[in-house]
Curated annotation (Swiss-Prot):
Gene Ontology CC, one term: nucleus
Any single GO BP term: meiotic cell cycle
Keywords: Chromosome partition, Meiosis, Nucleus
Subcellular location: Nucleus
Native source species: Schizosaccharomyces pombe (strain 972 / ATCC 24843) (Fission yeast)
Primary localization class, coarse: nucleus
Function: Required for correct meiotic chromosome segregation and recombination.
Name assigned to this protein: Twin horsetail protein 2
Lineage start: Eukaryota, Fungi, Dikarya, Ascomycota, Taphrinomycotina
Amino acid sequence: MENQVSSFLIDSPMEWKTYMKSLSDDNPSFGDVTVNLTKISVSSKNAKSYAEEMYNYVTQEMVFISERSRLLLRAKRRLYKNQSLMKKTSVSTSNTVKMVFMSLAKQIEQMLKFCMMVYSKLCEAFETTLKVAKEFQICDSSQEWFFQFQLGYHRKQMELQMLSFVAEWLVLTQHYTDALNDSAKTLYDIMESSHKAAQKV
C-alpha cells in the first residue's frame, strides 16, 4: 500500500477510485515491511533484533488490515443500499436484470463474509506473534530456542501463506464490490428511464 488510508467514509465512486489507485495489484500487501523482514535470519546472534523487528512489523500490519476491514464493511453497506434500490424499481420487465444483480450481490456478500473470517483469524495469529515477540525480548537465554522456533514458525505462516492470501482476497473482493456498486445505480437509472418512456408512448 503506497498511501495510508484515512478514516473518512468512502462512499462516492470518486473517493473509492482514489483509494483503489493507491493499491499495488502487482504485489498486494499491507505494507513494505515484509521486504525488509525477510532479510533478517533467525539465529542466536541476532535473535533479539529479529524479535523486535517482528513486533514492529506485526504492529504495522495490524493497522493496515484493520483499515481494510473497515473499507469492506463500508463496501457491504453500499451493497445493501443498492440492493434496496434495485428492489424498489417499478419496472416489471426488468426481473431478469434484477435477478442477475441480486445473485451477484449474494455472491459478493459471501466473499465479504469470507474476508472478514480470514481477517479475524489473521488478527489472532498476529496477536499470538506479538505476545511471543514481546516475551522473547525479556526471556532467559535458556528459553531463547523455544521463542526463536515460534517466531520462525509465525514468520513462515505470514510470509508464505496468510498475508499474501488475505491481501489478494481483500483486493479482489473490493474490486468486485466496487464494480457491482458502480453498475447498480446505472442499471436502476436505465430501467426507470425505460419505464417512463414506455408510459409516455
